[in-house]
A protein has these predicted regions:
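Glycine/tryptophan-enriched, flexible segments
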Residues: 1-140, 252-357
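Active-site-proximal binding-pocket segments
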Residues: 68-266
Length: 357
């Protein structure tokens, strides 16, 4: 222990207002520190994690059902090894339980363990090719989105005012909490890249500033994946309206983060412009859609695939696949059929198999 200096009064820690600091822009962030990290880990493995596999896709449930360990891993208050080993211990404990006691735990922890492996995989991508934080992984996309991004579109997306309720709710929740589940992170980035046709760098920087779990090795490969510029990953152009109906069917999440839509009936909450009284809300309390989402998605798809169809595209994609592709997936070069992954993939998964399995 450190002895107090005699003759000095400790006093009180000044508040942010007394220090003339700006108001906290992220009031709902997780508490940090080693103790909080251990509580979070134990709570997930012992109580919260059972519905993980099925609940992680929806922001309605993901804030509780996901591990919420990512900030602790990013800041070092928990180590990857201890999280992996604690997961394996819990998996061994399940073997002694009856099927009714196991419930959904086995599938949940298998899925979670897989994501720990993927975390290391993506970090290795950036370590291997650091330029992908700044440059398109596949050079054929260098001329895809040129010039400065449309400022009005970028700022509407940043503020959560695109006029697409589910997208805006996710952005506002992220800004207030510093966290969002993976699927919705992907949707936010895909909407910026495809629907708003923004170069991935500026939206990627904005999200990086918001995430309390920002990890460059995970963030930038994912940003490029969701923007379609890797050349080897599936093009996923999320329908922002369908995602709302799928992940928040009753509009509970949207209403929490977009209180200006309180008067909109449930059946119109994801498409308020279809409500007969839309004029009382749109462009007053809440903006009209910034663009026709179906039209801009179609245009984006055509632009992306026109580049992929070029004869010279495949050679570069094969180089990228050979360097960065997951060997465990068994994915062949882009022009060939896939084959099953070999059984012995221990080295390729960083040797992190649970002991005894």
């Amino acid at each position: 222990a450190v002895a107090a200096t005699s003759g000095l009064e400790a006093g009180t820690i000044p508040s942010s207002a007394e220090l003339r600091l700006a108001p906290d822009a992220c009031p709902g962030r997780q508490r940090g520190g080693r103790g909080e990290g251990l509580v979070c880990l134990t709570g997930f493995l012992d109580r919260r994690g059972e519905p993980y596999r099925t609940a992680m896709s929806s922001p309605l449930h993901a804030f509780d059902a996901c591990s919420r360990l990512s900030p602790h891993l990013a800041w070092g208050t928990l180590a990857m090894r201890e999280v992996a080993q604690a997961t394996w211990r819990r998996q061994r404990e399940l073997k002694a339980l009856s099927p009714s006691e196991v419930g959904r735990w086995r599938g949940a922890l298998t899925s979670f363990s897989g994501r720990l492996h993927w975390r290391c995989h993506f970090m290795q991508k950036l370590e291997d090719e650091p330029r992908l934080e700044f440059e398109n992984l596949h050079r054929a996309y260098d001329a895809l989105r040129t010039g400065e991004p449309d400022r009005a579109r970028l700022e509407a997306w940043q503020r959560g005012e695109t006029g697409w309720p589910f997208v805006d709710a996710c952005m506002r929740a992220l800004a207030a909490t510093g966290w969002m589940n993976f699927r919705m992170r992907a949707m936010l980035m895909a909407v910026a890249s495809y629907h708003l046709w923004l170069d991935w760098r500026r939206p990627g920087e904005h999200l990086a500033r918001l995430f309390t779990d920002y990890e460059p090795g995970i963030h930038w490969p994912q940003v490029q994946m969701q923007s379609g510029t890797t050349g080897i990953n599936t093009i996923r152009i999320y329908n922002p309206i369908k995602q709302g109906y799928d992940q928040d069917p009753e509009g509970v999440f949207v209403r929490k983060w977009l209180p200006e839509l309180d008067a909109v009936p449930d059946r119109f909450i994801h498409e308020p412009w279809k409500w007969e009284n839309a004029a009382t809300v749109l462009d007053k309390a809440y903006p009209s859609p910034i663009l026709d989402h179906a039209q801009v998605a179609k245009a984006a798809r055509q632009k992306i695939w026109s580049i992929r169809a070029a004869p010279e595209f495949r050679d570069e994609a094969n180089r990228i696949q050979g360097r960065h592709g997951s060997r465990k997936s068994g994915m062949a070069n882009t022009g060939r059929r896939r084959k099953p992954a070999p059984r012995d993939t221990r080295q390729l998964t960083l040797g992190l198999e649970p002991p005894g399995e």
